[in-house]
Amino acid sequence: MNKVVLAGLALILVRDCDIGGPRFHGQIKGTWGGDNAGLMALDTTAHIHIGCTAGDTKQAIVADEQGRFDTPGRYNITLYPVARGPDHPARFTGSTDGHVMTLTVTLTDTAVTLGPVQLELGKEPQMGPCPICRKPGR
């Protein structure tokens, strides 16, 4: 075979491959933990902590076909040691392959952004001095 035919076959094979590897899509569930961050995802909501701050989504977190998500919710950046409020409107954005997640919290009424943080499914969050709530909405 000549080189042009081989190059054409190689391009066809590469086009049909998923070079980025498998991606997770669908509803995110379970406990995800990292350094000074955690996420507990249930059927209808999720509870997120980054440092001494926390918030909840208004719905389940669902990743698209690329493993990306963008979910609305509320977030309190003045939570610890005494919750002073208010809860700010927020967007919880990121991506996952189903085992590792990158998460960013953006308050939509201020210029505050937390993260990105990296979380692992099934890993206990390592929160340091700030406690983590065990139930969303708490």
Question: Could you tell me what each predicted segment is?
Answer:
Residues 71-95:
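An anionic, turn-rich surface loop/hairpin at beta-sheet edges
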Residues 19-20, 55-66, 100-138:
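Edge beta-strand at a domain terminus
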Residues 53-55, 77-86, 109-113:
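Short, cysteine-centered beta-strand-loop-beta hairpins and adjacent loop/turn segments enriched
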Residues 21-40, 71, 103, 126, ...:
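Tryptophan-anchored aromatic micro-motifs
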Residues 26, 33, 42, 55, ...:
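Residues that act as N-cap/strand-start positions at coil-to-secondary-structure junctions
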Residues 4, 11-27:
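Bacterial Sec-dependent N-terminal signal peptides
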Residues 35-77:
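N-terminal glycine/threonine-rich, aromatic-flanked beta-hairpin/loop signature
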Residues 14, 49, 127-130:
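Mature extracytoplasmic/luminal segments of secretory-pathway proteins
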